[in-house]
Amino acid sequence: QRQMCIRDRVDPYLRPLYDALFDLLGFEKTRTLMERQTIEIAPLAYMRGRTLNNAFIILDEAQNTTPEQMKMFLTRIGFGSKAVITGDITQIDLPRGTHSGLIQAQHVLAGVRGIAFTYFTAADVVRHPLVMKIIRAYDRAEGKKD
């Protein structure tokens, strides 16, 4: 009963992740894998104290983590695990004056063996073609090059 209450509260925030899984695997396959706990979707707040061994871990929307949250997440990685962290530093929604853990991680972890960064541009957008044009327009307005 308690678990359902937590799930009911956090599900709206995790909706984009569910949508991506449904698009990739289909509803039934996703549901089956979640019932078997092969796939677990959990808010970052519930990671403290855990060690995730033999797992493929995804932290989505990481631009909105604080430096403390990012460090906590990164130190959950256990043996046999890989982690992928995604985020768009042009879409930070943190309160003014709060630093992004994703930006800090880029600086702190640059050059650390076993860690790699991949950067995408408007050309990598896999949404409606108009979205690519919107991103390019914002980049031009901010003085960025394609």
What are these regions (language model features)?
Residues 1-6:
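Short, small-residue-biased leader/transition segments that mark boundaries at the very start
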Residues 7-41:
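Mechanochemical coupling/switch segment within NTP-driven translocation systems
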Residues 35, 40-62, 132, 138, ...:
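Helicase P-loop NTPase motor core of nucleic-acid translocases
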Residues 38-39, 53-56, 70, 80-85:
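Loop/turn-to-beta-strand initiation segments
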Residues 106-146:
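Conserved coupling/interface region of RecA-like P-loop/ASCE motor cores
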